[in-house]
């Protein structure tokens, strides 16, 4: 497996999903499936990355993604080290570049970074010799979330993405998850619909390869899957949406609305959820929900990413 992977994986970094060819994407998902199977065993730890080191540099708050990467690294027997902005020299005025160069002097094999500035991961990848994984940069991209979402859908759909319809619902304007999912899923032939109040749709969305809706009933009709996004409550304070009750009345995914989708439609949510606001509790806990499947897929997918980058062909970008 390792020799084959080295011959197939040329990328030093994972910055966004559009850097991957279809063959590379499928190879990554197939690798994740192998790790997913390992994660179901009584003994989940494998020596695949023993002796490798992974630094988790989260300059923006995170619980789910950071924990998922930490678990992924440890299950591969890598040494993982966590650094948050509150405990780093960034708080003392040190530049991002100098902080990263200091970390690289410790010779990690992979640096996983989350940062509030769009482009931060690329900035580091262009300057550091170690592999860099973008765990979210501003509103720009969240490639590992899109990859685990794709993996979760593949578990249901198989490889028949072409012609499927996915509705992404919620705060699209400020969502790096939506942006990466649109890029990835449309490249596989999925028809993507975006649904949000006009104030939560991004500028230039008319140029995206999607259909845009402000009416949720129309957006979910005959969809194969619906992805709800977390509503960031500070958006109401900024005047970007009406009061929360009105938002819930118009944009909460309820059983009645899900019935408008196809009978076998699945529901996704990147978490954390605001139950009763963007998604009804009965839907979040229903058999149609893939929310917990996404969590399991996240560990397996991130194991695959760390493995592929840490054992990559030298010289790839």
UniProtKB/Swiss-Prot annotation:
Keywords: Pyrimidine biosynthesis, Transferase. InterPro entries: Asp/Orn_carbamoyltranf_P-bd, Asp/Orn_carbamoylTrfase, Asp/Orn_carbamoylTrfase_sf, Asp_carbamoyltransf, Asp_carbamoyltransf_Asp/Orn-bd. It comes from the Bacteria. It is an enzyme of class 2 (transferase). Carbamoyl phosphate binds at residues 64-65, 114, 142, 145, 271-272. Catalyzes the condensation of carbamoyl phosphate and aspartate to form carbamoyl aspartate and inorganic phosphate, the committed step in the de novo pyrimidine nucleotide biosynthesis pathway. This is Aspartate carbamoyltransferase catalytic subunit. It comes from Nitratidesulfovibrio vulgaris (strain ATCC 29579 / DSM 644 / CCUG 34227 / NCIMB 8303 / VKM B-1760 / Hildenborough) (Desulfovibrio vulgaris). The gene is pyrB.
